[in-house]
Every structure is written in structure tokens, then in C-alpha cells.
């Protein structure tokens, strides 16, 4: 958080023009910035890395513009998590518009790929379900304690990671005491 607090600017399309500490009250007294509008073309020499937290299917529009300025990117969307274009298009149902970068993207799981992440130009941050599934599986697979086709992942998640836009499926009165299948 100290690095975030020392940044010269921060961008949030949804909150452009609003004070950071008004949107994120826990930062009150620590940061004196307003959220700015994203101007990709003017990033140039201002930044070394962009942490891109945009919806899935949007990052692939921004990443080429950012990388063409030789700026490193950490992408929180799913757009670069898979390094195979055909697999991505099968799972997400859309064409990937920047497939040439997919094979060279580093999967941002530091417990597994720490050294590769350090030197990466594009890091695909893993999602919560893959992280929950991969981390406990690494030692049991490495030690050959289980057959790969015998692994069952039964993961549950709260609604806090579902984004800030209200939806019937994430509205607390509709979710409280309910279990909803994800991604079926």
C-alpha cells in the first residue's frame, strides 16, 4: 500500500474527478489525489507499470496500447490468463484481439512463478478460484499423492469479489443463505 500511496496519479474511470479518500475512506489522511481519466497515449514516461483492473474482454483493448509504450502491465482480468487463443475463445465465447501476446504472458501466481514475474512485461493475475484450486494442488501433485483425474475442487466464494455494480445475483437479500453455481 505504501507504493500506491506514493504514486503521482491514479486512474479510475468510474470515479474520475472524485477524491481517492472519499471513494476509499480507509485511505483518508494517507493520500491526497483525485482519480483521473485514463489517457493511455499520455502514459509515456510517467509510469513503469500499469495495474489494469478492467472487466474481462476490455483489457485486450488496452494492453497493446500500453505495451507499445514499453510499459509493464499487471492485468487483473481473464484476458491473458490462458496462453492459447483457441482455448480462450472456447471458454469466453469471443475472439481474442491480441493473441500474439498470450503465449508470452506470465501467470501471476508468485508461489509458483515468482522469478518469472519479476522480469515479465505482462503478468496475468490469477483469479480467486484458480488460486484456490492451484495452491493446495501443487504439493499433492508434485509428490504424486493423487491421480490428476481424481482431483475434485469444491470451492465457495462470497459476493465481495463480484464487482460493485448491483445485480440481482449479487444483491445480498437474494444471496443470503443461498448457494449459486458459478460459470455454468
PLM feature spans:
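N-terminal Rossmann-like NAD(P) cofactor-binding subdomain of oxidoreductases
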Residues: 1-184
Amino acid at each position: 500500500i505504501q507504493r500506491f500511496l506514493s504514486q503521482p496519479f491514479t486512474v479510475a474511470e468510474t470515479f474520475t474527478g472524485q477524491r481517492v479518500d472519499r471513494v476509499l475512506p480507509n485511505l483518508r489522511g494517507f493520500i491526497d489525489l483525485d482519480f483521473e481519466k485514463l489517457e493511455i497515449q499520455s502514459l509515456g514516461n510517467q509510469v513503469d507499470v500499469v495495474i489494469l483492473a478492467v472487466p474481462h474482454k476490455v483489457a485486450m483493448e488496452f494492453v497493446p496500447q500500453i505495451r507499445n509504450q514499453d510499459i509493464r502491465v499487471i492485468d487483473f482480468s481473464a484476458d491473458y490468463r490462458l496462453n492459447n487463443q483457441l482455448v480462450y475463445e472456447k471458454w469466453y465465447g469471443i475472439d481474442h484481439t491480441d493473441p500474439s501476446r498470450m503465449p508470452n504472458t506470465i501467470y501471476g501466481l508468485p508461489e509458483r512463478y515468482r522469478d518469472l514475474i519479476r522480469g515479465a512485461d505482462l503478468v496475468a493475475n490469477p483469479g480467486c478460484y484458480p488460486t484456490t484450486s492451484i495452491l493446495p494442488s501443487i504439493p499433492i501433485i508434485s509428490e504424486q499423492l493423487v491421480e490428476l483425474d481424481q482431483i475434485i475442487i469444491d470451492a465457495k466464494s462470497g459476493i465481495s469479489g463480484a464487482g460493485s455494480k448491483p445485480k440481482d445475483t449479487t444483491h445480498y437479500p437474494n444471496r443470503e443463505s443461498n448457494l449459486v453455481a458459478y460459470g455454468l
